[in-house]
């Protein structure tokens, strides 16, 4: 934390992978004690490592969390949210996927292991947005 007491910032990215029928790739977060947004369906997302670009973060989400290659597209939107002890700044991007997403085994260093994958309408992300999911709020507000 900076010496002036201001909250430290963290950057993150999330992806909105859309099929031709308009459904968006959704992942279910673990329903475990201590997990943020337990059991909620949301967008695949990742906190960026120091020096990691948004595009690199999107590709990492594909490899580590979806077992598929992602290509970044246009920005859906950006958001900021105060969390416990830090400020989260997130970009949500459209992305295309090569192959079918799958739940890989826990990768070394991965912080969230999703428990399920599905394709849902954008309106389905409203619950997660209301429960505090920044990426889902950005998606729902953009109405893409």
What are these language model-derived features?
Residues 1-25, 44-47, 78:
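Conserved N-terminal beta-strand and adjoining loop/helix that marks the start
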Residues 48, 125-126:
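A generic structural signal for short hydrophobic patches within well-formed alpha-helices
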Residues 79-105, 118, 122-123, 138-141:
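Active-site-adjacent beta-strand/loop module that shapes the phosphate/pyrophosphate-binding cleft
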Residues 102-111, 127-132:
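Short, charged, solvent-exposed linker or helix-capping segments at domain edges/interfaces
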Residues 132-144:
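Charged phosphate-binding loop/patch that engages nucleotide di/tri-phosphates or the phosphate backbone
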């Amino acid at each position: 934390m900076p010496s002036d007491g201001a909250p430290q910032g963290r950057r993150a990215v999330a992806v909105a992978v859309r099929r031709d029928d308009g459904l968006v790739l959704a992942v279910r977060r673990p329903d475990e004690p201590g997990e943020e947004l337990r059991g909620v369906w949301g967008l695949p997302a990742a906190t960026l490592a120091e020096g990691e670009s948004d595009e690199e973060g999107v590709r990492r989400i594909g490899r580590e969390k979806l077992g598929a290659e992602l290509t970044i597209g246009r920005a859906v939107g950006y958001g900021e949210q105060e969390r416990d002890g830090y400020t989260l700044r997130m970009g949500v991007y459209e992305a295309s996927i090569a192959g079918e997403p799958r739940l890989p085994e826990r990768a070394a260093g991965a912080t969230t292991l999703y428990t399920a994958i599905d394709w849902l309408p954008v309106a389905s992300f409203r619950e997660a947005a209301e429960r505090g999911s920044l990426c889902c709020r950005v998606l729902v507000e953009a109405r893409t």
